Amino acid sequence: DIGNLKNASLLYGKSVNEDLQSGQGHLFAAHLKETIPDHYREIPFGTGHTEYTENIEKLKELGVRMFVGEFWYTGNKEWKNDVKDAALFLRNKLDPVFEEVTA
């Protein structure tokens, strides 16, 4: 969970990518969510401090190709739009990293 790892990095002084590197050969999927210092739940995508592009690039380097996003239902009647917005946010982070280079 790169969001939780980001908060842990503030506590322990080890970057998220260093932490991910320590799992080399043992990671096959990643959990994507937003966090802010000391808060781990119900943070809308794009409003926190999770370093998506940098971390997704590292995960790609480590062979990770499966990702799951964490979506929170907070009682909003427009929850379907919240899910669409979150999915679009994550696609906009994942797609450029995994985009094929064509000549």
Task: Name every feature range the model reports, one short phrase each.
Residues 1-49:
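Acidic/histidine-rich catalytic cores of soluble enzymes
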Residues 4, 74-75:
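Solvent-exposed loop/turn segments at secondary-structure junctions
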Residues 15-19, 23, 51-58, 82-90:
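A general structural detector for well-ordered alpha-helical segments in enzyme core domains, enriched
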Residues 25-28, 62-67:
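Short, well-ordered coil/turn segments that N-cap beta-strands
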Residues 55-64, 93-100:
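A structural motif corresponding to the C-terminal end of an alpha-helix
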Residues 68-72:
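Short acidic/histidine-rich active-site segments
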Residues 77-103:
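C-terminal helical cap(s) of enzyme catalytic domains, especially alpha/beta-barrels
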